[in-house]
């Protein structure tokens, strides 16, 4: 495991979610009622950054073409599915372990 520091827990609590750069990845992180979630932030359809969090449904939507992903599993729930050049098995997005370590949100990449 390689835990990488992202943003402060206080900042995430206030913002509820953020797309953060972690090494060579962009990761969407969220704090919903004290539970932390992390998944790839780049949509598998048109490579846009995910940004529309639905706290009640635990989903995040891509603003470009409205693809919808489950925050817990990374599974795509509503199409469009993938960019024409993307592998067909790449329907969902990778999820990551996430933790609060001394007031900092860390993601295991």
Curated annotation (Swiss-Prot):
Pfam families: Rieske
Keyword Repeat: no
Cofactor, free-text remark: Binds 1 [2Fe-2S] cluster per subunit.
Cysteines engaged in disulfide bonds, as pairs: none
PROSITE patterns linked to this entry: RIESKE
Keyword Transport on entry: yes
Record-annotated Rieske domain positions: 3-107
GO cellular component terms listed in the entry, alphabetical order: cytoplasm
Annotated binding of [2Fe-2S] cluster, by residue: 43, 45, 62, 65
Family annotation (InterPro entries): Rieske_2Fe-2S, Rieske_2Fe-2S_sf, SDX-like
Organism superkingdom: Archaea
Cellular localization per UniProt: Cytoplasm
Keywords for this protein: 2Fe-2S, Cytoplasm, Electron transport, Iron, Iron-sulfur, Metal-binding, Oxidoreductase, Transport
Names of required cofactors: [2Fe-2S] cluster
Record GO terms (molecular function): 2 iron, 2 sulfur cluster binding; metal ion binding; oxidoreductase activity
UniProt cross-references to NCBIfam families, sorted A to Z: SDX_Thmprot
Sequence similarity: Belongs to the SDX family.
Protein name in UniProt: Probable sulredoxin
UniProt lineage: Archaea, Thermoproteota, Thermoprotei, Sulfolobales, Sulfolobaceae
